[in-house]
Amino acid sequence: MKSLMLVVLGNTEISTVPGISVAGATPELTKLTPPADAEYLFYEKPKIIDVIPVTPDGHPTPAIITKAARELANFPLMIVRGGTYLAPLVPHVHISDYVGRDFRKGPALQEAEEIIARARLFGEELSNTPIEELVIGESTPGGTTTAQAVLWALGYEARTSSAAPNNPQSLKEEVIKAGFERAGIKPGDFKEKPLEALKQFGDPMMAAVVGIALGFKGKVVLAGGTQMLAVAALLKALEEDMSRFMIATTKWVVNDRSATFIDTAKDIGIITYAADLDFSKSEFKGLRDYENGYVKEGVGAGGATWLAVKAGFSPEDVSRKVDELYRRLMELKAT
């Protein structure tokens, strides 16, 4: 089966709420994480900033897993700009430069339908190629909060994961409740109005992935953790046949006790795959800490591992390759 991997980039103002996202060394730097992640997949290090995206504690972006899987299995990969502050300095498909707004102050994404329409055209074009399967990952700091807001609006009692070991769940809920008050709704009020849920609380990555998935007629693997559950829930509410979709994530998301990944996936009715990566024997603390609940997923890490496994590599091969890439980064840093 011919597969193509897409990584959809998105930004939301929610990532700059202090304490909500660790997908960047500071809240302000989360604005640069999506293009930097995209660039790292193609170059030895990002162009837009001189460092690889890290958490405030120095844990490397999960793009390192996607890059490792790709170096092993050599699958084709394209970057899609769903809506970001800055364009990545790699060839990419431009859907929009709209950024998700802070939904406590007003609707998050008035342009949702425009983004879906453009992304749908792209999905339709991909259907005219020999590609039979899309594996769609994302890089969207703050996106687990927008995902949880959308899931709640659609009536799911979901808790999303976090790139931090201590999931800022109470802060997320406080932000979401403020957004619901602003919109004058209760959880579940947009069950029959998925596009309204997306407009009020979503982000441009979600809108772009929904559009691509609506336009493409083959199999779609949503490569991500709890953020892709929100995409799946939107697609289901839009009456898509869920049998052509699956979610590929990592064991770290599935094992996250603070989130409801498996239960929410069952509620939506989508099958899941969890990449059994193991960094416990890594020589680098930044990677070993993935086993302690840091980072967990992103940039399609689980889906990329799944593609490598389909190509005959093991999760152990991917884990070893990640170590090698991290070593290369350390050597670059030293020069």
Swiss-Prot record:
Q: Which Gene3D superfamilies does this UniProt record tie to the protein? A: 3.40.50.10210
Show the stretches that span the lipid bilayer: none
Write out the GO MF terms.
Answer: nicotinate-nucleotide-dimethylbenzimidazole phosphoribosyltransferase activity
- InterPro entries reported in the protein's UniProt record: Nict_dMeBzImd_PRibTrfase, Nict_dMeBzImd_PRibTrfase_arc, Nict_dMeBzImd_PRibTrfase_sf
UniProt record similarity statement: Belongs to the UPF0284 family.
NCBIfam families per record: nicotinate mononucleotide-dependent phosphoribosyltransferase CobT, PRK04447.1-1, PRK04447.1-5
Q: What is the name listed in the Swiss-Prot or TrEMBL entry for this protein?
A: UPF0284 protein TON_0688
Identify the species of origin. Thermococcus onnurineus (strain NA1)
